[in-house]
């Protein structure tokens, strides 16, 4: 019986129907959007803290961004206590050292949700998470930079990615075009056409 079970297991592995357990990994996505004269930042996902080193002191920072220094934090505009983890110096962290030019922090005008941020160190990367964060817990937050543009904040549009321990953190910097006059006219015409159709069906 044992021999039969082992043979069946090998067949499933060879067919790709059964795979050995792999180390867990988590992903978190951050998006900066420029739209209608403001910049918004959102963070969503979860993290696996395995292999990351907890710092003894985690400063309470408000949400902000300094792209030239490779720093951003999403969440409340007020200083919030957080836990700061570092990638170790043995190579379990990689990614861009900057995503723009401004090295001075610009704080968000408002924000809400869980703390999440990345800071670039000489030999490692730092990760800000909610105080007492447990691996796999959902992180959701947003911040607003009212009246700001990517140019004001020194952010370069594009897509950036960090490999931090078992985690992949992506940062997308995208501009959302404002609606043109032509698109507004088309929208109004579509709504008007729909109303006429409903009237015909009503008759």
Functional labels for PLM-detected ranges:
Residues 15-22, 195-196:
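C-terminal segment of classical bacterial N-terminal signal peptides
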Residues 193-203:
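C-terminal membrane-anchoring or membrane-association module
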Residues 7-13, 185-189:
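Sec-dependent N-terminal signal peptides
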Residues 24-175:
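Mature extracellular "passenger" or substrate-interacting domains of secreted, surface-exposed proteins
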Residues 1-9, 180, 197-198:
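Bacterial N-terminal signal peptides that target proteins for export
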Residues 177-195:
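A short, hydrophobic C-terminal helix/tail in secreted or cell-surface proteins
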């Amino acid at each position: 019986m044992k021999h039969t079970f082992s043979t069946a297991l090998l067949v499933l592995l060879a067919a790709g129907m059964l795979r050995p357990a792999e180390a867990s990994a988590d992903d978190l996505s951050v998006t900066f959007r420029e739209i209608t004269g403001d910049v918004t930042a959102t963070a969503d996902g979860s993290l696996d803290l395995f292999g990351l080193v907890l710092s003894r002191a985690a400063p309470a920072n408000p949400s902000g961004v300094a792209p030239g220094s490779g720093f951003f934090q999403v969440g409340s505009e007020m200083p919030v206590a957080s836990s700061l983890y570092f990638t170790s110096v043995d190579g379990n962290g990689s990614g861009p050292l900057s995503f723009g030019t401004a090295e001075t922090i610009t704080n968000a005008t408002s924000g809400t949700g869980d703390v999440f941020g990345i800071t670039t160190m000489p030999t490692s990367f730092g990760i800000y998470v909610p105080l007492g964060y447990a691996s796999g817990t959902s992180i959701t937050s947003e911040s607003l930079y009212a009246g700001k543009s990517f140019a004001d904040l020194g952010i370069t549009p594009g897509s950036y990615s960090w490999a931090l321990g078992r985690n992949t953190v992506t940062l997308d910097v995208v501009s959302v075009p404002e609606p043109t006059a032509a698109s507004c006219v088309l929208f109004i015409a579509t709504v008007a056409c729909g109303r006429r159709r409903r009237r015909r069906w009503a008759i």
